Structure formats: C-alpha cells, structure tokens
Amino acid sequence: MKILSVNVGLPREVLSGKDIVTTGIFKEPIEGPVKLRKLNLDGDKQADLTVHGGEDKAVYAYPKEHYDYWQLELPNTALPWGMFGENLTTEGLNEDAINIGDSFRMGSAEVVATQPRLPCYKLGIKFGRMDIVRRFLTSGRPGIYFKVLLEGEVEAGESIELISKDENNITVKDIVRLYVKDNKDVNLCNVR
C-alpha cells in the first residue's frame, strides 16, 4: 500500500444553481512532505465543521483503483488526483480489507480507520452532476476517513504500513452496506 498523491485545498465559494455555497471539496495535489495534524493536513481545511472534519475525519483517503472504475463509468470526465475531495490518493488501501479500528503508519504519522465517507451534495457540485452522489454511495467505493493518532509528515510515494488489525472484523465496506441496503443484517448489527 502506498500514497500516490497528497491533496489539499482551502474552502472556497462556488455557485450551485442560484446559490453561493462554501466548500472545501476542491483539492489539488502538492509536492513534498506535508504535516498531518490532529484535525487536517497543513494547507487543507473543511468548510462545514458540523458535518465534515473533526478528529474522526481528519484525513480522507481514496484508492486509485476506484479511479479506474470511475473512468469507465464517466468516460468524458477528467479525473485528476483529488477529484473526489480526498486528501490522500492511495494504492492498495481497499475498503473490503480495512476494518474500522485498523491502524496504519503513513510517512511518520500514525492513523486509525474510523469510517467510510457518506458523501454530501457538494460532491455533485464538484462533478457538475448531482447523480454522482447516489452513484458514489451505491458503488460501494466510499474511501476511508482516518483519525490521527500521531502527527507526522506524509508525502507522495511513501508506503502505508499496517500497524494493527482491529479484532472486530467490521470492514469499511460493511458499514456502507449497512447504510445503503443491508441494514437488517443481524450478524453486522449485533457486533459489540
């Protein structure tokens, strides 16, 4: 597993229909090491802290493998790294294999997987098509939010190392499945 790109962006105002909306979803790849702090990366900020950011959503990672899927789904759409609003574009970090609670070393930082991304309407603003929100959610390709356990630096090209595997075996994808369609799955709902 490795980091392919580190992407940051500050909130900006954009036009959505007739409304002006403030969003932090626009991320750009940057070169060199970047400090990963308890609430975000240096040079990055979330716009609406009532639903975005905080310690449990300090950094958002999205796998390159999903870009391959979306390129087939949206063949006429440019998909540069950061297009999905992710801070880290990764390789090999798959929601099927990552448990909520798994911890990792990324560069000199340590993080723990906390939850999948459940997108808001601002993803639709970024893509210029509101159907992407539903398509993203039902695709089962949510990406992963991480909490920062130990601040450090991250950089494109660095490896992502598993430190410990959570014993509950609830994957990031399991959570999305419960949210989207299988909310009566007794085996998942009864985990303590």
What are these regions (language model features)?
Residues 92-94, 140, 150:
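Short loop/turn positions at the edges of beta-strands in beta-sheet-rich folds
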Residues 127-134, 138-148:
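Active-site glycine-rich loop that binds ribose-phosphate moieties when present
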Residues 160-164:
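Short hydrophobic beta/alpha edge segments that flank linear recognition/processing sites
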